[in-house]
Design a protein with these regions (language model features):
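Flexible loop/hinge segments at secondary-structure junctions
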Residues: 2-12, 16, 24-339
Length: 339
């Protein structure tokens, strides 16, 4: 997913709302001035390190490449290790920024005081499948998806699925569930949605970055889940939309609260997030209650969420931070949410 394409689902007004006063928050020292261009001698590189969610990794890597083209002395390294790892490294101050698909819980916010949440993108969690001969047309309700991941629906030709898909030839084959094996913001988004649409899921499993999966195979990262689904027949999983676009993987149309079955796309994710900027916390407050799942609207895809860049209001709390790095990080952040 390119940065230019993703502008259709980045709500710049949200970013401006949150980071409009960013220069007042991101402090290094009394001599640091926001907007003063970072300068360095030829070959005097400034290294910025980040880690976290694989959910927005295609976007983040593309942004880094674009930024380096016009800022060749600033090298931004991002490790796609999952939201749990990003939050942990942000809290431990071993990276300059983290990225998480889930906002910090109140307890995590307390462990990392003066953290900022900066929404850098809005993305969709999709349900890819691998059924030979079925490339399009599969429809699923939230309850059916929950029952599949609970291990209660075990065959592709289960009556619950075939009744909903009379024109799709579904095989008498066992469903192979693929889920994340690592702490994951994608899992948090997906399980939060399942908990909203299925009382059984809420009671038996609940929502979280890491849950006790009732069934299935584990794989690390969105890349791992996508790889297992793409290479193994009769599988089903959950991944971020960008990984489907990259691999042209079949995905299910999911039922939204208005009763429409909607395929994931940049347009339907944007529709779900429309108006999200009307009632958001400031960047320096807790975002633990923020979600945009199951948004109203006939064309709204139901499993949509922000990804958050995590920074400290005072960057000098990070042990290896210096003034050049602070300026470079601030300039990249402002570029990422404005351009």
């Amino acid at each position: 997913m390119s940065k230019s394409n993703n502008n259709t689902i980045i709500f710049v007004t949200i970013a401006i709302l949150v980071v409009g006063g960013l220069g007042g928050y991101l402090l290094f020292g009394s001599n640091t001035e926001v907007g003063e261009k970072t300068e360095s001698k030829k070959n005097d590189f400034i290294d910025i390190n980040g880690a976290g969610a694989s959910f927005p990794f295609p976007l983040v890597s593309n942004m880094i490449e674009q930024y380096f083209e016009s800022n060749p002395t600033i090298r931004i390294n991002y490790q796609s290790i999952g939201s749990g790892g990003g939050v942990r490294q942000h809290t431990e101050k071993t990276v300059h920024f983290g990225i998480s698909d889930a906002p910090l819980k109140d307890s995590q916010f307390a462990d990392a005081p003066n953290s900022l949440h900066i929404p850098i993108t809005i993305g969709a969690v999709v349900v890819p499948y691998n059924i030979p001969g079925v490339d399009t047309g599969l429809k699923l309700t939230g309850e059916i998806v929950a029952d599949i991941f609970l291990g209660k629906i075990t065959k592709w030709n289960d009556p619950a699925i075939t009744t909903l898909n009379p024109d799709v030839e579904l095989p008498d084959k066992a469903i192979v569930v693929v889920h994340r094996s690592d702490g994951s913001g994608t899992s948090f988004i997906f399980t939060s949605w399942l908990a909203e649409v299925s009382a059984d899921w809420e009671k038996e499993v609940g929502a979280g970055k890491a849950v006790e999966w009732p069934t299935g195979l584990g794989a690390a990262g969105n890349e791992g889940v996508a790889g297992v689904v793409n290479s193994n027949e009769y599988t089903i999983g959950y991944i971020e939309l960008a990984y489907v676009i990259q691999n042209n993987t079949p995905v299910a149309a999911l039922e939204n609260p208005a009763g429409y079955f909607v395929l994931p796309s940049l347009e339907t994710a944007s529709e779900a997030a429309r108006g999200a900027g009307d009632d958001l916390p400031s960047g320096k407050d807790t975002w633990s209650k923020v979600e945009i799942l199951n948004s109203p609207g006939s064309n709204s895809y139901p499993v949509v969420s922000f990804s958050y860049m995590l920074l400290y209001q005072e960057l000098n709390v990070i042990p290896d931070m210096d003034e050049k790095k602070a300026k470079a990080l601030l300039e990249f952040t402002l570029w990422a949410v404005h351009d």
